[in-house]
UniProtKB/Swiss-Prot annotation:
It is found in: Cell membrane. The keyword Translocase does not apply. SUPFAM superfamilies: P-loop containing nucleoside triphosphate hydrolases, Transducin (alpha subunit), insertion domain. Signal peptide: none annotated. It is an enzyme of class 3 (hydrolase). This is Guanine nucleotide-binding protein G(olf) subunit alpha. The lineage of its organism: Eukaryota, Metazoa, Chordata, Craniata, Vertebrata.
């Protein structure tokens, strides 16, 4: 009997346990409330757009501007990716010389063995980037035939950073090469899956989600739609004369327009506004001024397009460039105004994702818009 009496808790002990439970529950509830408030205070931005539009470069800019950029170890890890970009670029160009119509011969026949060497190493995945490789690349890039083939790169699939890194082959080949911020911005690595970047601007928390833009990646987008503050849609304006990698047939800008329309009219996104980044303005200007690929050859309606009276060109901007960029802007705005129901809006901005100052300025301009969307999202406006 004595043993049974000792095993039961006194009323006083039970009271202490109950008090501890209540205090523990209070702490948990307080923490949950804190997390709920932090969640509500966070601006969630979803980056969407077709493949190779510049979404990942925008994320890199946010890291440079708001997360102290990349540390030395991260830069070191990117060296292999950058050298792979060089290899992919030169392999693609020399391989295309014989396949485009009409084909392009080497200007210097003595470079033939170099071209053969580059083609021979194309399938090697764990390639050792020797000085021999860099010497061959440098000589080939100096060949006028290779340059002529590069000028026709809209006829085949070439990464945007090809010229940038081929022109910097001397520094990229150095044993003690350290990538610059601009090198990191230019480096092309295929985005597969969903990547989240967190940063803070003036004590406001932002979560930016970058998802792959290729067709087979888009099924993953739906996972990111929950509680999104705003969509940043990135369109490569310079792609008006290019075709997508997936089928080598569909015009890239048409694909971007179709994708934008499907997002704009998506029933799950009818209340989420879109910030439209009309990207690659630097490359668009180069193409327009070069005059080799005319926009009207791909978009016949351009022939009758007139720049709106309220259009404001950049200082010193060529009128041909102004007309081209506003034409592309209006292609997207035509979609948003045709089916808009007043529940969401489209805010266009001209961007150059590799230009840090441009992205700083544009993102600062967007912050007020994002804040208004956030207040509306939680019915505070």
């Amino acid at each position: 009997m004595g043993c049974l009496g000792n095993s039961s808790k006194t009323a006083e002990d039970q009271g202490v346990d109950e008090k501890e439970r209540r205090e523990a529950n209070k702490k948990i509830e307080k923490q949950l409330q804190k997390e709920r408030l932090a969640y509500k205070a966070t601006h969630r931005l979803l980056l969407l757009g077709a493949g190779e539009s510049g979404k990942s470069t925008i994320v890199k800019q946010m890291r440079i501007l708001h997360v102290n950029g990349s540390n030395p170890e991260e830069k070191k890890q990117k060296i292999l990716d950058i050298r792979k970009n060089v290899k992919d670029a030169i392999v693609t160009i020399v391989s295309a010389m014989s396949t485009i119509i009409p084909p392009v011969p080497l200007a210097n026949p003595e470079n033939q063995f170099r071209s053969d060497y580059i083609k021979s190493i194309a399938p090697i995945t764990d390639f050792e980037y020797s000085q021999e490789f860099f010497d061959h690349v440098k000589k080939l890039w100096d060949d006028e035939g290779v340059k002529a083939c590069f000028e026709r790169s809209n006829e085949y699939q070439l990464i945007d950073c090809a010229q940038y890194f081929l022109e910097r082959i001397d520094s990229v080949s150095l044993v003690d090469y350290t990538p610059t911020d601009q090198d990191l911005l230019r480096c092309r690595v295929l985005t597969s899956g969903i990547f989240e970047t967190r940063f803070q601007v003036d004590k406001v928390n932002f979560h930016m989600f970058d998802v792959g833009g290729q067709r087979d990646e888009r099924r993953k987008w739906i996972q990111c739609f929950n509680d999104v503050t705003a969509i940043i849609y990135v369109a490569a304006c310079s792609s008006y004369n290019m075709v997508i990698r997936e089928d080598n047939n569909t015009n890239r800008l048409r694909e971007s327009l179709d994708l934008f329309e499907s997002i704009w009219n998506n029933r799950w996104l009818r209340t989420i506004s879109i910030i439209l980044f009309l990207n690659k303005q630097d490359m668009l200007a180069e193409k327009v001024l070069a005059g080799k690929s005319k926009i009207e050859d791909y978009f016949p309606e351009y022939a009758n397009y007139t720049v709106p009276e309220d259009a404001t060109p950049d200082a010193g901007e060529d009128p041909k460039v102004t007309r081209a960029k506003f034409f592309i802007r209006d292609l997207f705005l035509r979609i948003s105004t045709a089916t808009g129901d007043g529940k969401h809006y489209c805010y266009p901005h001209f961007t150059c994702a590799v230009d840090t100052e441009n992205i700083r300025r544009v993102f600062n301009d967007c912050r007020d818009i994002i804040q208004r969307m956030h207040l509306k999202q939680y019915e505070l406006l």
